[in-house]
Amino acid sequence: MTTREQGTLRTEVTERDHQIGPADAPITLVEYGDLQCPHCRRAHGVLPRVIRRLGDRLRFVFRHFPITESHPNALRAAEAAESVAAQAGEQAFWKMHDLLYEHQPEWEDADDDTRILELAKEAGANPDTVAADLESDRYEEHVKEDFMSGVRSGVNGTPTFFINGRRFDGDWTTVDSFVAALEEAAS
């Protein structure tokens, strides 16, 4: 794979993806994230303000990229988020996404799914159904598809961002710097 290809999003955004914002927005931001990653949690603190500032000019897409070697509960969290989405819809997915990041220290080192299931209930899902889905690995393949789409795009860490299909390795740590990069991509 050439350097140019590694900097390109190889899997197009589809209805399968979790998205906020209009499909025809001039800016599409795709994040490959790990729900247990502390850097992704930091990005989560910036992204809602970026989304608010850009409004309908931005479509934000989240794809799972659990790095289980470093974050052993990341896959479980991603599968739980998918179970919540299947049960309660896209808004519930985003609530679960937010809750998992906001409460990350409470579940990241847990030996069981108790706290993740409590968060699933808070997000609007039936925790017994989420538990059964986790037990059967019902959404593992979905999460792995996200992961492999990241691998094909050259993702090797999280968070990794793509702006309008091009990898963004700039400063995402402040709202102003991230918005400036996004607006530049749209011009």
Place the predicted regions along the sequence by residue.
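Structural alpha/beta surface segment adjacent to cysteine/selenocysteine redox centers
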Residues: V30, L35-Q36, R41-K121
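N-terminal targeting signals for export/organelle localization
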Residues: M1-T11, E184-S187
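C-terminal cap of thioredoxin/glutaredoxin-like
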Residues: Y32-G33, H44-I51, L117-S187
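Residue-level signal for pocket-adjacent positions within structured domains
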Residues: T8, V13-E15, E102, T129, ...
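A short beta-strand-turn-helix
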Residues: R10-I27
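Short, flexible loop segments at the rims of nucleotide/cofactor-binding pockets, characterized by
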Residues: G7-T8, P38, R138-Y139
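Short clusters of hydrophobic/aromatic residues that line enzyme substrate/ligand-binding pockets
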Residues: Q19-I20, W107, F168
